[in-house]
């Protein structure tokens, strides 16, 4: 209890701290420089209409790109030298593929009846082979049990 009644030095320390802390005036900063006045935007030249290439021009550019690539240039450089974008190149390349290649598989008629009969035969053969394998495994298992004396 003696410690609670002895408040003299603590009160003196608090009073000393209060005297030391004197508020100081804020530092003044120089004003910000004015932003440069925005110049009015120059209207851009109207975008030119996209160039339309004829089929002959497209094929010529595709051949040019192919020859440059075969000479050792990269595909990207060859496309840039032709003056077209990569997307345009791939679009033209896809459109230039002969249609016969895409439909070659579908033009050959598939005999549905023959394939179904073959499928049925294969399924039957598969079942026979599975039964044979199961029988063989059972006999081997029985022999091993006899050898080990588990039966």
Curated annotation (Swiss-Prot):
Q: Where is this region: Disordered?
A: 1-61
Q: Which InterPro entries match?
A: Homeodomain-like_sf, Transposase_8
Please verify whether the record's keywords include Nuclease.
no
Task: Tell me a Gene Ontology molecular-function term this record carries.
Answer: transposase activity
Family assignment? Belongs to the SyrB family.
Indicate, by first and last residue, each region the UniProt record lists as having compositional bias (Basic and acidic residues).
Answer: 52-61
**Protein name according to UniProt:** Transcriptional regulator SyrB
Top-level taxon in the UniProt lineage: Bacteria
